[in-house]
């Protein structure tokens, strides 16, 4: 059996249908699609969800609260911290199973532990000279397809990732004509990847997901939580993460004091809600159309809030286990933490550390 995990970054479940996304729709109808999609971790951002796809571990164990991680009492970028747990790639290596990773965001290789794969692209986590890049400097879908076509896919586990949907939504907004055109293009790119799997389709389980969706961030002014906290002298550290923010209390702050700060955060104009995610971690999110930051927003679309937790979740393929997993996601909504245990079970690997 070969297991393929394909991620379309930020791709909205809501647009999957026969007209706009015929290739995704073919897999959804020949296999199974969760009626309400999957559900991301909070915050609804890229790197923490991708790391958890491969570890199956929650943020309370990894410190991956978003694109920022809280590890050893300091913030670090999640792609710099690495997965902070044993991954499917680690398990494949121990079990002498072969693995491949071909991704459209080169930072994901370190984030997901995919540099441990037998074959990974971009090589050593950096796009080779001459690679077609999108406006944010990530490999375009066409580069991913070419790399996949030049890779031996007769292997046990494959990770594919397409990044252009996320970039287009950030630049133009998720409801824009440019984003809709990108949905169609990336569906075609996805179809090209599926075609590469056809020779071994009878023995393949294909899991297709997105990590989150996006929302418009067209309000002319960001919510400046960090500067407010500094001016108020709050004993916290804060990192903005699109329409979400991570607030970590200093060690000396009591639970009672931190609870008072939660209330003050929720009274700030532009903040819609928040949740205590760990004793020292509060996750906040903006009102619709707003994002955290300073001055004018840098994007027309973003993510981070609970409004962006919906994921694509489709299981297909010619192997009989595809039907079993498909029935499971039809009966119970999957989430980010569902997939590592599922992949491990399919490949006969041990459970997560």
Annotate each predicted stretch with a short phrase:
Residues 138-153, 157-160, 165-206, 216, ...:
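A long, amphipathic alpha-helix that forms part
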Residues 237-342:
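Active-site neighborhoods of enzymes that stabilize oxyanions during catalysis
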Residues 4-7, 23, 185-225, 275, ...:
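Metal-dependent active-site segment of extracytoplasmic phospho-/sulfohydrolases and closely related
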Residues 110-112, 166-171, 322:
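Short acidic/His/Gly/Ser-rich catalytic and metal-binding motifs that mark active-site loops
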Residues 2, 12-96, 105-114:
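Active-site nucleophile/metal-coordination loop of metallo-enzymes that catalyze phosphate/sulfate
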